[in-house]
Amino acid sequence: HPELGDETIAVVFFMDLGLKRCQQMFADLNRYAVRPSKSLGVLYDQRDEKAELARLVVMRAPFFKDIVEMEKSSLSLRSRKLFTLSAFYSATKSLLDGINQDERKEEDADTAIEYWEEVAKQFPEWKMVHDRKMVAGEVRQDFIHSHGIVLQALGSVGNSLLRENKTGWKRKLKSLKKIDWSRNNSKTWEGRAMI
């Protein structure tokens, strides 16, 4: 392409002061220019305590590490992931809203991991995707429990349970198994989680 010989591009150089600093600059620069995916912003943002907490939870929970897409904010039908980091970030933020304290990051991460792992036990399809016995795209297509809005709602439910019932919340989550989460159950989900 000889026509590219006359083109110019702007280049900005920054001194490399370490990986965290470079990632923060990436988050700052790209957040206001051509916006990166929300998940990529959450992945690299070093200032947002909630983003750091969401990353910590995903990285420390082997189950979620395998089913959360860290960079993209939308999932293709062929993606092996069930959730995006941005959806998991919003859900974990809802879960710990008013409960967590930034200076107790490790405790907050442990609480979130315990909660999300217990939630995962209520959805056999999640485990089947994790174990590669089901295709993630089909689960996302056929069930609403793998949608970001439901994940965030589960975070809000967890927030209420953790505030009101510190000892019996795991037992209460077992009720999730009794719900018909299929998209075909439009009588329940139409107008609530589906349009």
Where are these regions (language model features)?
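Accessory terminal alpha-helical modules
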Residues: P2-I195
